[in-house]
From Swiss-Prot:
This is RNA-binding protein Hfq. Residues 77-99 are annotated as: Disordered. Residues 10-71 form the Sm domain. RNA chaperone that binds small regulatory RNA (sRNAs) and mRNAs to facilitate mRNA translational regulation in response to envelope stress, environmental stress and changes in metabolite concentrations. Also binds with high specificity to tRNAs. Coiled coil: none annotated. GO terms for cellular component: cytosol. The lineage of its organism: Bacteria, Bacillati, Bacillota, Bacillota incertae sedis, Caldicellulosiruptorales. One of its GO terms (biological process) is regulation of DNA-templated transcription. The keyword Repeat does not apply. It holds the Pfam family Hfq. Keywords: RNA-binding, Stress response. Homohexamer. InterPro entries: Hfq, LSM_dom_sf, Sm. It comes from Caldicellulosiruptor saccharolyticus (strain ATCC 43494 / DSM 8903 / Tp8T 6331). Signal peptide: none annotated.
Length: 99
């Protein structure tokens, strides 16, 4: 994920993955899966279910994802902004020193 290209879906899924939050995934068919998100890309999710089996689920088949607890997915945005600001300040300091 590029630093300047953060989107809500990636922030949400990545925070669920990093915190290993249990989720219930509701599929369009009405089926429900419970487990932990292990990874994702633009089109799929890998979920480890309660019986320790991994399933690859296509995002277009998902209706919604319900986390078992609230998550702070905006923390990634704030961390990214702090890192970008620090990097810019460091670059500015280096540019001033070289003059």
């Amino acid at each position: 994920m590029a630093k300047g290209n953060l989107n809500l879906q990636d922030l949400f899924l990545n925070q669920l993955r990093k915190e290993k939050v249990n989720v219930t995934i509701f599929l369009l068919s009405g089926f429900q899966l419970k487990g932990v998100i292990k990874g994702f890309d633009n089109f799929t999710l890998v979920v480890e279910t309660e019986n320790n089996k991994q399933q690859l689920i296509y995002k277009h088949a998902i209706s919604s994802i319900l986390p078992s607890k609230p998550i702070n997915y905006m923390a990634q945005v704030q961390n990214s902004q702090v890192q970008n600001t620090a990097s810019q300040q460091s670059n500015n300091n280096q540019n001033q020193e070289s003059k």
